[in-house]
Regions:
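Membrane-interfacial loop-to-helix junctions in multi-pass transporters
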Residues: 1-8, 119-125
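Specific transmembrane alpha-helical segments of multi-pass solute transporters/efflux pumps
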Residues: 41-42, 75-87
Length: 150
């Protein structure tokens, strides 16, 4: 990887972090789009995952007293189920599929009818959110717009 690509990735990570911090959204999607433009799908997924783990993990540490562990457990179980299913069938999205899903993800959350919108207070919804968000993460690398609706 050239120094120019590394510099572009570092600058993009910084700028999209500011976008997320200021607007509270969209930074991860922009970052993933740039990663997919410059890297292969597996490389983009790993780099985005490590970046998100660092930023979201730190945020979880800072806000740990506000975590609803019931919601966390349900989400974690759903995530594990989706991850297990993907591991069994060994699906890796192609770049065109990843870009298409990345592009439609913001509209999925807005297009859901009221009765299908995920709600943290409703029974089983944290589990369902874990499944849906993990599938989106494994296909497009982002799930923020769906998680925001949740």
């Amino acid at each position: 990887m050239s120094a120019a690509v590394l510099a572009t990735l570092a600058a993009t990570a910084l700028v999209t972090s500011f976008i997320s911090g200021i607007l509270g959204m969209a930074g991860g999607m922009i970052f993933m789009g740039v990663l997919l433009a410059l890297l292969t799908v597996p490389q983009a997924m790993v780099l985005h995952g490590v970046t998100q783990l660092a930023s979201n993990g730190w945020r979880a540490v800072l806000w740990r007293t506000s975590i609803d562990w019931r919601v966390f457990r349900g989400n974690a179980y759903g995530s594990l189920l989706a991850l297990g299913a993907f591991a069994l069938v060994q699906i890796v999205a192609s770049k065109p599929v990843a870009l298409l899903v990345l592009g439609i993800t913001p509209f999925i959350g807005l297009a859901l009818p009221e009765k299908l919108v995920l709600d943290v207070q409703r029974r089983g919804h944290p589990f369902l959110c874990g499944v849906i968000c993990t599938v989106l993460q494994l296909v497009a690398g982002v799930s923020g717009p769906i998680l925001d609706v949740f």
